[in-house]
Amino acid sequence: MALHWKLVIDTADAPALADFWAQALGYEVEDPSALVEQLLAAGRLPAEAVAEHRGRKHFRGFAAVRHPEDPYDPFTGIGKGRRLLFQDVPEPKTVKNRLHLDVHAEPGGLAELVARLESLGATRLREEGQGPAGHWYVLLDPEGNEFCAA
């Protein structure tokens, strides 16, 4: 049986990094505001566990993005398919990622993809390969997490 999964990424500012990756991937930022409001009203969530971003309440220190074509719970906003969850952590990133995302350009569109990602806040680190593995760029997201565009 195949398992459902999500990739969890440690951050300093979960909502901001979710915004970047939603734009970079063409994903939707999840909106848990209805669930947050319900939990607040029922006294099951303390006010200090809630923050607001772009006019919507969310769980403090967390944000997620999901593929726009994948199923999701319309009340909670939580995706049931391809999903990235960002969680705030107190320590800064200090070493290279052991896991990273590769984003793929349309044929012939790598330069345009890299330029678009840079316009969203990514930083180009280096260009790699021209051999059998192909041609790609290593970039950093706004918090310094490595990813590749190929």
Q: Predicted segments — roles?
A:
Residues 13-14, 106-109:
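Helix N-cap motif at beta-to-alpha junctions
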Residues 2-9, 19, 23-25, 31-93, ...:
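Vicinal oxygen chelate
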